[in-house]
Amino acid sequence: MTTVHFVYPRDAARNSSPFCIGNEVGDRLARDYDVRFYGWRDKVKIEPKPGDILLGHPHWRRDSVFERSVRQPGWARRILMAPYADDLRQVAYYDRHMAQCDLFLAITGNYWFDRIEDATIRRWRPKMRHMDLAVNRAFFPFVKTRFNPPGQRKFLYIGHTAHNKNVGYLSRLQLQCESVDISWAGRGRKKIPGVHVLGFMDFSQPEALARVAAYDFMITVGAMDANPTTILESMAWGLIPTVTMQSGYENRAGIVNVPLNDVAAAELVFSKLQAATDAELLEIQRLGQEAIDRHYRWDRFYADVRAAIDGTESPPIRPATWKERLLIKTFDLVH
C-alpha cells in the first residue's frame, strides 16, 4: 500500500480552519493509503522510501518538516496543498518549493483562481489546481429558520483581525452605514471600533448556535483572503454571506457580494437586503443550501486530492524573472 506523508494541522476536537481541512482530508486518506501525519510546524526530516508521497502545507520556518523533507531524493510525488490569494505576504515562501513539487493544490475561491494570470506568481499556474473549499453539515447544522423583519436585520462577523481580514473597513461600515448592524464573534490583536463585541464563541455548543440564529447575514470584507471557511459554515447554518469578492467568492449562488473599500456602494447593498422580502431572502438561502449539498462537499474536495496523488501530472514552470525573484524574495524575508 502506498504511504502518504501528510503535513497539515489536525485536531479532532477543532472544526475551524485549518484543522477542518487536515481532519477531513486526513480521515479520508487513512481509508485509502498508509498515512503518516505531521503538524506543519514539526521539525522532523522525512526520509522517503520507494513509492512514498509527500502531501501538505509548508511552513515559512526553514526548519519545518515540509521544508526539510521536500528536497530529499526518492519521493514518488511531491504535492503542495495550501491556501492561495494574490498576496505575497501570505504565499511568497511557497516559491521555495514550487519547482520541486509536482502540483500545487491551491485552496482558494474562484475570484483568485480566475486572476492568476495577473498575479506576480503567474509562472506557478501550470502546477496549480483549484481546490474549492467544503463544509461538514454535521458540525454546522441548519439553524436559521426565519429572518428578522425588514430594517431590523443583523450582521455577524466571525474571525480575527489579521491584515487580510481588512477589519478597518468593517469598522467604517458599522460607523458610517445606516443599514448595517455588525457584531463580532472572535478574538484578535486589534480592536474593531463600533462593532458589538461578542468574544470567542464555541459553535459546537447549542447556546452559541441559538445566538447565531438571531442574525440574518454573515459578513466578511477581506482584501486578500483566499476563501475563509466561515463563509460556507455560516451558509450551512442558513445565514446569507455578504462578502467582498476579495474574500474568494465572486457571483456564487447563495452569496451576496459587497464592494471592497467603498462605503457608499456597500450601503446600497445593505439597504436592499434590509428592504428585501422574506421570500427574496429565502430564495437566496435556498440557493446556498443547494450549492452546499451539490458542490461544497468534502468528498468532492478529497476526490481532487486523490487524483493528484494517484496521477502523473508534473508540469514544469518557467524560471522567475529578476523582478519576480526580487519581489518574492523580499516578501519571503518578512517571515
Language-model features, listed with the residues they occupy:
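Donor nucleotide-sugar binding/catalytic pocket of nucleotide-sugar-dependent glycosyltransferases
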Residues: 102-142
